[in-house]
Amino acid sequence: MKLLHERMMHSLARYPRQTAVVDEQDALSYEALELRIREFVAMLCALGVGQGQRILLWAHKSVDLVAVMQAALRLGVVYVPVDPLSPVSRLEKIAGDSQAVLVLCTAARLEELAGSALAQVRSVVLDDPASAGYWRNIDTGSSVVPTLAIQPDDLAYILYTSGSTGVPKGVALSHGNALAFVDWACERYCFQPGERFANHAPLHFDLSVLDIYCALNVGATVCLVPESIAFSPRLLTDFIRQHEISIWYSVPSVLMMMMQDGDLLSDIQDTLRVLLFAGEPFPVKHLRDLRAAYADVRLANLFGPTETNVCTAFEVGAIDPERVLPVPIGTAASGNQVWAQKPDGSRCAVGEEGELVVQGPTVMLGYFAKPAQEGPYKTGDMVRQRPDGNYEYLGRRDDMLKVRGNRIERGEVEAALLAHPQVSEAAVLVVGEGMNAQLWGVLVAHTRDALSLIDLKRHCAQRLPRYMIIDKVLCLDALPRNANGKVDRFALARQVEG
């Protein structure tokens, strides 16, 4: 079984009545999920969507969305999940880059689509039976499911990340890329039939790959955390209890929020067996508290960019009371090889700082519509190997930022700010850590008229997803620059923090 959808079908044969997926309103067994998948397969065939074509998923999490993903995989159709709260302008960029032939959306977004460059792209509504575009209103009587030859190296899905030119980049991932990680994770963490995974991460975020595909791989249940409670700490803790969650995977800032404001440390969730985190460093003082409160729970730090999924992992045991640095990112994972590399291409010795390089089965096919990824992937992450073999994360080599676990290309936010008619120059930086991290825009205006933060936020909301919208603004007469003419970001940080 070398294809993603074959794993769900294997679980169907073994555990047909086991609950497969749960959302706010529905719960489907593997049998019921299979029937729903077949309905969506018929729908896609009726619409003429064929192998290798791309479809956009611009809708909130639901059992139907999971079924659409599976249906697409069976037909060799490439699905592209998009933040359901993204402005239509971002969807236009992604649709243009991916050359999508279909948009699956909520009824509430139809009007925006009609007034956009996507008006000529077929749209299907997932959530409103009263809508003329509702998926079940499509005539599937004459649809024929083709016989297909799908290979492990075929493209399965595309995850769009922030792009340095202001245009999102599509990370193209194959069945084999995903399954190399899924198989490793299932074996490493001993996932079992009947366990219950919480899917906290949005479906356009690579953390969701573990939640969805590991669960369906082993005959477990994936419980979709509604977007409406994704940042409500007490409700998240309640979600764990109500759904008897055994596997939790999220960014550290969400866990810290639950610890500080959701009673996760005092209201012990005894169904938890595995706690996984990724996406940003976990401040050790908070991680130490979590480790102490959940002494019998398996706790691990997973690391890797979207381009490689998880390429290293570290098991968190007892934490030295004197430790102040974050725990390591660990050693190679998912069948990959990793090493630290110097600028001249030579490998670093133990203790030397270098760029993390990854080679192996989870490395992406490439960026969609760009040249294929050849050879090892340079992550842009600076690391150092310790004598015990574990790697420590030291920061980014380039201009990538992380805010509350979200990866943000500085240039995309700056490009959006510069599109404002009153902005002459723009620089972006992050101040603070974890849930306290804030994205600052430092601006130079064309005129002396004051720039309104509310106006800037509204302006950015038309161009960027919400996690990329600035939290604070500082206006200067000129941006500080160093001797070579580049913006002096150290001086910027001093001005913002001062």
UniProtKB/Swiss-Prot annotation:
A single GO cellular-component term on record: cytoplasm
One annotated GO biological process: secondary metabolite biosynthetic process
Presence of keyword ATP-binding: yes
Gene Ontology MF, one: phosphopantetheine binding
The keyword ATP-binding belongs to this UniProt entry's keyword annotation: yes
Assigned protein family: Belongs to the ATP-dependent AMP-binding enzyme family.
Protein name: L-proline--[L-prolyl-carrier protein] ligase
